[in-house]
Curated annotation (Swiss-Prot):
Organism: Geobacter metallireducens (strain ATCC 53774 / DSM 7210 / GS-15)
Function of the molecule: Provides the (R)-glutamate required for cell wall biosynthesis.
Record: residues binding substrate: D10, S11, Y42, G43, N74, T75, T185, H186
GO process annotations (BP): cell wall organization; peptidoglycan biosynthetic process; regulation of cell shape
Gene Ontology MF terms: glutamate racemase activity
Protein name (Swiss-Prot/TrEMBL): Glutamate racemase
Keyword Mitochondrion tagged: no
Coiled-coil stretches: none
Entry-linked NCBIfam families: glut_race
UniProt-listed Enzyme Commission number(s): 5.1.1.3
Annotated active site: C73, C184
Entry-linked HAMAP family: Glu_racemase (MF_00258)
Length: 270
């Protein structure tokens, strides 16, 4: 079991920021990443559809003999995590709970901000998770949809990025939050401009970092860490042509992706 890979999936490239943190925390581990590029974005789909997609991808990854599954997608974490945990016999980790736990732990004023896509904010998934941990925390949310194309275009520190950040984050500054959750896997690429805009006194919680920390804890606690000092191998699969995934993915991962293979989930089921 320890020699098996970690499976990770997202609707596209955003989950590569989670993979990047997992590689940083657990460099010896093998990983298998699936980006559902044929059906991105998930935020516009119904919860039932997102759950069906997630179960299909989980089946694909489980057949490749993984030891743990990371749902590196906020929408899928909000809609499908429970179904995945009930269906699979391996640990399943989403990105919402780790970020929520960290935010509830570090806030001093009891006022936490959450930014994310329109779908994630509309689901109230982070607010509900934070409230479950500490009902006294006040959660202020803001959808920041333009951050996604900015991250994918690499416009992460120019005037457009700064203007967009000021527009989105001014209300959170006025609300007096002392902690801000980056509730989208694209947003770590904009961490610098977000931090400068919201102010250094506000603690940024990166859900990708927190998810990697939880994954490490689970593997260590279950004696599932790969017992070697050698660097792990990383494999990439997508459901549509990989050219765009590779172009943007190199930036998200902070290095060059290896080979990326296009697969048909329908064919896999046959």
């Amino acid at each position: 079991m320890p020699w098996k890979a970690i499976g990770i999936f997202d609707s596209g490239v955003g989950g590569l920021t989670v993979l990047k943190e997992i590689i940083k925390a657990l460099p010896q581990e093998d990983t298998i990443y699936f980006g559902d590029t044929a059906r991105v974005p998930y935020g516009t789909k119904s919860p039932e559809t997102v759950t069906r997609y997630s179960l299909e991808i989980a089946s694909f990854l489980v057949h490749r003999d993984i030891k743990l599954l990371v749902v590196a997608c906020n929408t899928a974490s909000a809609c499908a995590l429970e179904a995945l945990q009930q269906t699979l016999s391996i640990p399943v980790v989403g990105v919402i709970e780790p970020g929520a736990r960290r935010a509830a732990a570090v806030t001093r004023s009891g006022r936490v901000g959450v930014i994310g896509t329109e779908g994630t904010i509309r689901s109230s998934a982070y607010a509900k998770a934070i409230k479950r941990i500490n009902p006294e925390v006040e959660v202020v949310t803001r959808a920041c949809p333009l951050f996604v194309p900015l991250a994918e275009e690499g416009w992460t520190d120019n005037e457009v990025a700064h203007l967009t950040a000021r527009t989105y984050l001014s209300g959170l500054r006025e609300a007096g939050v002392d902690t801000l959750v980056l509730g989208c896997t694209h947003y770590p690429l904009l961490k610098r401009v977000i931090g400068e805009t919201i102010g250094e006194e506000v603690k940024l919680v990166d859900s990708a970092e927190e998810t990697a920390r939880i994954v490490a804890e689970i593997l260590r606690g279950g004696e599932l860490l790969r017992p070697t000092s050698e660097q792990g191998n990383h494999h990439y699969f997508v459901s549509d042509v990989p050219a765009g995934f590779i172009r943007v993915g190199n930036r998200f991962l902070g290095g060059k992706l290896g080979d990326v293979y296009q697969v048909s989930l329908e064919a896999e089921k046959e």
